[in-house]
Structure formats: structure tokens, C-alpha cells
């Protein structure tokens, strides 16, 4: 069972629909007991970092997520969910994240139109069970104004270019992040979710 954490930050219906297509049983929840019982966790989200962290803390789920991560449970963060994994965001202030990954979030370069919205290609940075080894620059769907700006280089699986390097897929142990929306990224996005679920079994 996959627990999709619902802290009021969107894109859950399309994500659950994508998982249903893969015959993956998921529940949408804010209950600590259900999250702890799940085989894996997905932290989705769109919107502001500060608001998301406040909602997660009010639900007392920050410590639950951190504890489950420490136990080795697979956790996938999508879009804002991926950004919440990091230590810090400089989005309209200086905000503390979940600290599951080292690094920080900053606004995308002012030289390009923000938000970064629409289809963009992925540049594969290192081999992973998530990809076919012969994969050539697939297109995925992004919607974001902030991006990971500092990170551990060995966690970067794939990136995109939009005025700067955009970390698009990161992974460290049981923690995986996707800055784009796999559930909105066509056949490749569905294949990514499928391979992710196969990888964490």
C-alpha cells in the first residue's frame, strides 16, 4: 500500500489516477498510523514551501516522515514535495525543510520566464533502475518557480535546463525526488512511476 500524504497542496487526484492505472493500491491520508503501516510514502504538492511546511507541522507529520525515512521506508517527493526534503528554502524568507537531503531551494534565474511551466527535456546524469540505459532526453512536465540550487552531486540522477541547471530527479538511499510531475508526463511519466514501484519492492 502507498500512502499519499494530503496536507492540502494539490495534484493528488491525477497522481492517484496514475497509480490506479498501474494497479497500485494507494490511500490519501493525514493519519500517522496509516502512513506508518504503508509500504511506501508519496509526498506530493504545489504551492509555497512555507505554507506546506506549516501544514505538515500542524498535522504533526514532519516527525512521522522523518522517522519513516530513518527506518528506510521508500519516500517519493513530487514537485514541491521534493523541495520539502531539503534543509532550507529561500522562498520569500528563510524556511527550514524536512532535512532528509542536504541542500537548499532558491528562485529560478530571473533571465527566464518564471514559473517554469510546460514540457522540457531530461538530461540523464547517472544510471538508475528508473531509466532504460539507452534513454534519450525524454520530455517531462514542469510547473515551478523555485528549484534546488545546492545539493550533493552524487544524488543527481537527471537534470533539465531552464536558465540554469534544474535538478529534476534526485535520489539518496530510500529518498527519491522528482521536480516535474510524472503523473502529467505522458507515457514516460507513467513508466517512471511503474519502475519506481518495482525498484522499491
UniProtKB/Swiss-Prot annotation:
Reactions listed under catalytic activity: 5-[(5-phospho-1-deoxy-D-ribulos-1-ylimino)methylamino]-1-(5-phospho-beta-D-ribosyl)imidazole-4-carboxamide + L-glutamine = D-erythro-1-(imidazol-4-yl)glycerol 3-phosphate + 5-amino-1-(5-phospho-beta-D-ribosyl)imidazole-4-carboxamide + L-glutamate + H(+); L-glutamine + H2O = L-glutamate + NH4(+)
Protein species of origin: Oceanobacillus iheyensis (strain DSM 14371 / CIP 107618 / JCM 11309 / KCTC 3954 / HTE831)
Protein name: Imidazole glycerol phosphate synthase subunit HisH
Keyword 4Fe-4S: no
GO biological process, one term: L-histidine biosynthetic process
Entry's localization field: Cytoplasm
InterPro entries in alphabetical order: Class_I_gatase-like (IPR029062), GATASE (IPR017926), Imidazole-glycPsynth_HisH (IPR010139)
Keyword set, alphabetical order: Amino-acid biosynthesis, Cytoplasm, Glutamine amidotransferase, Histidine biosynthesis, Hydrolase, Lyase
Active site as annotated: 79 (nucleophile), 181, 183
Job description of the protein: IGPS catalyzes the conversion of PRFAR and glutamine to IGP, AICAR and glutamate. The HisH subunit catalyzes the hydrolysis of glutamine to glutamate and ammonia as part of the synthesis of IGP and AICAR. The resulting ammonia molecule is channeled to the active site of HisF.
Pathway(s) of this molecule: Amino-acid biosynthesis; L-histidine biosynthesis; L-histidine from 5-phospho-alpha-D-ribose 1-diphosphate: step 5/9
Amino-acid biosynthesis found in the keyword field: yes
One MF term in the entry's GO annotations: imidazoleglycerol-phosphate synthase activity
A Pfam family annotated for this UniProt entry: GATase
Subunit structure: Heterodimer of HisH and HisF.
The organism's place on the tree of life at top rank: Bacteria
Gene3D superfamilies per UniProt: 3.40.50.880
Chain ranges passing through the membrane: none
EC numbers for this chain: 4.3.2.10, 3.5.1.2
GO cellular component: cytoplasm
Every Glutamine amidotransferase type-1 domain range: 1-201
Amino acid at each position: 500500500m502507498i500512502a499519499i500524504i494530503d496536507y492540502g497542496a494539490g495534484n493528488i487526484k491525477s497522481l492517484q489516477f496514475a497509480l490506479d492505472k498501474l494497479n497500485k493500491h494507494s490511500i490519501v491520508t493525514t493519519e500517522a498510523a496509516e502512513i506508518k503501516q504503508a509500504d511506501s510514502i508519496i509526498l506530493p504538492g504545489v504551492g509555497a514551501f512555507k505554507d506546506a511546511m506549516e501544514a505538515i507541522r500542524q498535522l504533526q507529520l514532519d516527525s512521522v516522515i522523518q522517522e519513516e525515512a530513518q527506518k528506510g521506508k521508500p519516500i517519493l517527493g513530487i514537485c514541491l514535495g521534493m523541495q520539502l526534503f531539503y534543509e532550507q528554502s529561500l522562498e520569500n524568507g528563510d524556511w527550514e525543510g524536512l532535512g532528509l537531503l542536504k541542500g537548499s531551494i532558491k528562485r529560478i534565474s530571473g533571465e527566464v520566464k518564471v514559473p517554469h511551466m510546460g514540457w522540457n527535456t531530461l538530461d540523464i546524469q547517472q544510471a538508475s533502475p528508473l531509466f532504460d540505459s539507452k534513454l534519450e532526453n525524454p520530455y517531462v512536465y514542469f510547473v515551478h518557480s523555485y528549484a534546488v540550487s545546492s545539493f550533493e552531486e552524487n544524488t543527481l540522477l537527471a537534470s533539465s535546463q531552464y536558465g540554469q541547471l534544474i535538478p529534476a530527479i534526485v535520489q539518496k538511499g530510500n529518498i527519491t525526488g522528482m521536480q516535474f510531475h510524472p503523473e502529467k508526463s505522458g507515457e514516460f511519466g507513467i513508466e517512471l512511476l511503474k519502475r519506481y514501484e518495482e525498484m522499491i519492492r
